[in-house]
Regions:
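Flexible, Gly/Pro-enriched loop and linker segments at secondary-structure and domain junctions
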Residues: 18, 90-96, 124-130, 173-189, ...
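Active-site-proximal acidic secondary-structure segment that organizes catalysis
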Residues: 38-40, 45, 49, 184-238, ...
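Short amphipathic alpha-helices and their capping loops
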Residues: 3, 54-88, 111-155, 180-182, ...
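A short, small/polar-residue-rich loop/turn motif at beta-strand boundaries
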Residues: 1-4, 103-119, 138-180, 256, ...
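Flexible, non-catalytic linker and terminal segments flanking ANL/adenylate-forming cores
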Residues: 45-78, 381, 419-431, 473, ...
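Gly/Ser/Thr-rich phosphate-binding loops and adjoining beta-strand/alpha-helix segments
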Residues: 63, 68-70, 89-111, 178-200, ...
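Extended, hydrophobic beta-loop-alpha segments that form or line the acyl/peptidyl-thioester binding
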Residues: 28, 121, 125, 216-217, ...
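His-Asp-centered acyl/peptidyl-transfer active-site segments
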Residues: 87-95, 122-123, 180, 194-195, ...
Length: 505
């Protein structure tokens, strides 16, 4: 039993552990703490102490106050550049955050609204230069931001909309170089009837999916109400300076040390057919895509309501059980992509705020799905309580450059990403519209993309679930350097088998 599970089991009985003067204290109902509990606390005292110290450090990091200072790359941005920069930047795909939407306003109004948002967020105007002293951040002026225009008003209305969305996608697929003049670009397409489509493309190094939703909502607010309605967050730079200072201090060292020890204790999973170690590497990445139609998505949501959990947890458990059966391993780690916007003060922060939590998975053969899910839920809650804000490309304790060598191995075999896609406004509109997925088959048609040569680190397995409310786009990635084509086939089959067992047709 992990320490996280031990503490969760105690808390379920009302027994709360804490630290006072670096000594373990507990609060509990009368006679709740048994002699067996006390013996376990004594036997695992060192582990419990480390857990509680790390929990306190993570809590302190979540509450750190913004720190004013010079414009500086965040630790996350430095680690992103170490992953995505270099001569092969932009290959085979540009790593951008596309922000595209249709607006019931003309092109000049949307252009002005986009300009206002760009001026509001320094994080979208930052650029970088590399030198002997490391990576430097510089700020472009809001007045120098140029927004491209394309007039499609000569086309029939539906043709104009389809053309605009296609060209917006092409626009957002162009690489925004890390050391380019601008890492954010924008374009507005004028449509018949006084409408338009706006497209903003930011390099992932300066933005994330959460940033996308904030920006789209603010453009709508400016157009409809004259100004953003959301309470502004502090600047991304002030937030990241405070984070950097904290991680360099003693509590930051506690977090780094805890996760280094955790990582060193993790097993190295192996592929089932040839025993290849499931390590991150450079080479061929295979991608398989499919769509979950609305009727099936509704069943997932109903299952979540029945168990009083989120769809996120159901998908994570399906992925974990499939990985356990496929690898014939009951215990292993997974990285789960997350968001550092965990407080009201951070909820409207634009910038690189995504991170990846490391989660212990226990999925015993033959165990009931709900039992496995509850265990994963407890371990995920533990990971959040002990969060170190790292990116999934590196071992979890590598929160900033210099902690390990650049080629330090990443042996966490799988990454999971569940994204509730779109703003609340967008999801409501899609849900209220006609079901465009009614004719889609289930089980789905799986589309395998041509092999992609990735110069950057790839995870052995990576499952993306993009839930739009009315349908979900799913993308399953394999690093072929350690997951052979037969193993890719067997894992895909196992994933659909577990899904069918969990969410009956």
């Amino acid at each position: 039993m992990t320490i996280g599970m031990l503490i969760a089991a105690l808390e379920s009985r009302g027994i709360i552990l804490s630290l006072a003067d670096d000594e373990i204290r507990y609060r509990s109902p009368k006679d709740a703490l048994t002699e067996a509990d006390k013996a376990q606390l004594r036997a695992r005292r060192a582990e419990i102490l480390d857990h509680l110290r790390t929990r306190n450090a993570a809590k302190a990091l979540r509450g750190v106050a913004p720190l004013a200072g010079p414009l500086t790359p965040s630790v996350g941005q430095e680690m992103w550049r170490a992953f995505a920069g270099g001569a092969q930047e932009g290959h085979p795909v540009a790593l951008n955050i596309p922000m595209v939407d249709r607006f019931r306003h003309d092109a000049s109004s949307v252009t002005a609204a986009i300009s206002q948002v760009i001026a509001r967020y320094d994080a979208l105007r930052v650029r970088f230069e590399a030198g002997e002293g490391g990576l430097r951040a510089l700020l472009n002026s809001a007045g120098s931001f140029a927004i491209e225009q394309e007039d499609l008003r000569h086309l029939a209305p539906q043709d104009a909309i389809e053309t605009a969305f296609r060209r917006a996608q092409e626009f957002c697929a162009q690489v925004n170089l890390i050391e380019g003049e601008w890492l954010t670009r924008a374009k507005v397409f004028a449509l018949p009837g006084g409408e338009s489509i706006g497209a903003i493309s930011s390099a992932h190094m300066i933005a994330d999916a959460g940033s996308r939703n904030i920006v789209i909502d603010e453009i709508h607010d400016i157009l409809e109400y004259g100004a953003p309605r959301a309470v502004p967050a502090s600047s991304y730079n002030d937030y990241s300076l405070a984070e950097r200072e904290f991680l360099a201090g003693p509590q930051g060292q506690q977090l780094i040390g805890h996760w280094r020890s955790w990582y060193q204790a993790q097993p190295t999973l192996r592929a089932p057919s040839d025993g290849a170690p499931l390590l991150w590497g450079n080479g061929i990445r295979m991608v398989r895509n499919f769509t979950i139609p609305g009727r099936v998505l509704d069943k997932v949501h109903s299952r979540a309501e029945e168990w009083k959990v989120t769809p996120f947890l159901i998908y994570l458990t399906i992925f974990s059980v499939a990985l356990a059966r496929w690898s014939k391993s009951e215990h292993f780690p997974i990285r789960v992509l997350g968001d550092k916007r965990t407080s009201l003060e951070l909820s409207n922060m634009v910038g690189l705020m995504f991170c990846a939590d490391a989660v212990d998975i226990a999925a015993p053969a033959g165990a009931d799905f709900e039992r496995v899910m509850r265990g994963i839920q407890a371990e995920y809650d533990t990971a959040l309580a002990l969060r170190i804000p790292t990116l999934h490309f590196w071992a979890p304790h590598c929160v900033r450059p210099g902690i390990e060598a650049p080629d330090h191995p990443n042996k966490i075999p799988a990454v999971f990403n569940y994204y509730s896609m779109g703003t609340a406004r967008e999801r409501a509109e899609k849900k209220a519209g006609p079901d465009a997925t009614a004719a889609l088959p289930w089980p789905p048609d799986v589309v395998t993309l041509p092999p992609q040569q990735w110069p950057r680190r790839s995870s052995p397995l990576f499952l993306h679930v993009m839930d739009k409310g009315n349908e979900a786009f799913v993308s399953l990635h394999f690093y072929q350097g350690c997951v052979s084509p037969p193993d890719q086939d067997s894992f895909t089959a196992q994933l659909f088998q577990v899904f069918a067992e969990t969410v009956p047709a």
